[in-house]
């Protein structure tokens, strides 16, 4: 029998910051917002603020592999999606236009850069069976989760982004952002 650990026990980076509640240090993990895919028989985990991708054949044993320098490795909430022979990759950079990348070989590349046209936070690409591509993104209790259809070749929006889901922390307090997010 095999047991799986959730969260998966992989080595990742930490950030050390002054703790605003005391004179000590606050240690935060830097592998948030993971995106996991299965590609060519292996599992891959991409996480925020990491230079690596973790690879496994069995979801138990994981190896870290350094990713190519031309990827946005110090950005947040990476999203990886399989579409045919390609893996598409993007990550969040608030206030800056975010690009997309695609490859047929995650570890060795090359990664083809596809110029983005808008900034986003917490991206999620969806490749539909009918060939259409959709982008969803957002991470706030004050602004909505947005959605837009993208051109499957250029990854450019085919229309305006529209709000899909809006937060309402006064009715659903669990939507409050940050530490201790279950209280106001």
Regions found by a protein language model. Give the residues of each.
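Carbohydrate-active catalytic/glycan-binding domains of CAZyme proteins
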Residues: 1-184
């Amino acid at each position: 029998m095999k047991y799986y650990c959730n969260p998966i026990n992989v080595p990742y980076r930490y950030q050390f910051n002054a703790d605003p509640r005391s004179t000590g240090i606050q240690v935060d993990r830097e592998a948030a917002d993971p995106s996991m895919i299965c590609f060519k028989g292996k599992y891959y985990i991409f996480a925020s603020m990491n230079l690596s991708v973790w690879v496994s054949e069995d979801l138990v044993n994981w190896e870290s592999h350094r990713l190519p320098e031309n990827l946005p490795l110090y950005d947040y909430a990476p999203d990886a999606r399989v579409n045919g022979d390609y893996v598409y990759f993007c990550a969040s950079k608030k206030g800056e236009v975010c690009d997309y990348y695609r490859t047929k070989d995650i570890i060795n590349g090359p990664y083809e850069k596809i110029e983005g046209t808008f900034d986003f936070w917490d991206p999620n690409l969806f490749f539909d069976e009918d060939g259409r591509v959709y982008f969803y993104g957002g991470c706030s209790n004050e602004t909505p989760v947005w959605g837009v259809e993208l051109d499957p070749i250029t990854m450019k929006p085919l229309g305006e982004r529209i709000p899909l889901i809006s937060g309402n922390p006064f009715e659903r307090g669990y939507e409050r952002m940050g530490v201790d997010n279950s209280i106001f």
